[in-house]
Amino acid sequence: MMTLTTDKKTMNITEIQSLLPHRYPFLLIDRVTDYEEGKYLIGLKNVSVNEPQFTGHFPQLPVFPGVLILEAMAQATGLLAFKTFGAPKENELYYFASIDEAKFRKPVTPGDQLMIEVEFLKERRGIALFNGVAKVDGDVVCSAQLKCARREF
């Protein structure tokens, strides 16, 4: 369980874009509302009906794809990795390495605000392990264990 600090550290979209290589329509963290290096990060994703995935998923009943919830978690782990271990060298990147125990509990629809909470568990040989939870209005909609790796390209 995460222990939140009273002095919140935040990141706006400009700082997020300086750390992650993703861009529209694949940048899935709009804002970081709190983080502590080596411990946790809380990010927000505002789900809008104007996003391209809703033209086909599904036109009659738009549902935010579960794989994009997991990608948002992966991006949050990348941000926490940057803040915990520092920026990689010019020829390095944090890669999403694996996901385990992914569970989807409720659908996410346009108008929802996803709160992505990731918690750093441990690091070994350049591979970091995290727990991730996505919530809407305080209800868990998805949870998973994620790994990211720092590698040269």
Curated annotation (Swiss-Prot):
GO molecular function: (3R)-hydroxyacyl-[acyl-carrier-protein] dehydratase activity
Protein's recorded name: 3-hydroxyacyl-[acyl-carrier-protein] dehydratase FabZ
Pfam families, sorted: FabA
Family as reported in the entry's similarity comment: Belongs to the thioester dehydratase family. FabZ subfamily.
Catalysed transformations (reactions): a (3R)-hydroxyacyl-[ACP] = a (2E)-enoyl-[ACP] + H2O
UniProt KW Lipid metabolism keyword: yes
EC number: 4.2.1.59
Organism expressing this protein natively: Vibrio cholerae serotype O1 (strain ATCC 39541 / Classical Ogawa 395 / O395)
Gene Ontology biological-process entries: fatty acid biosynthetic process; lipid A biosynthetic process
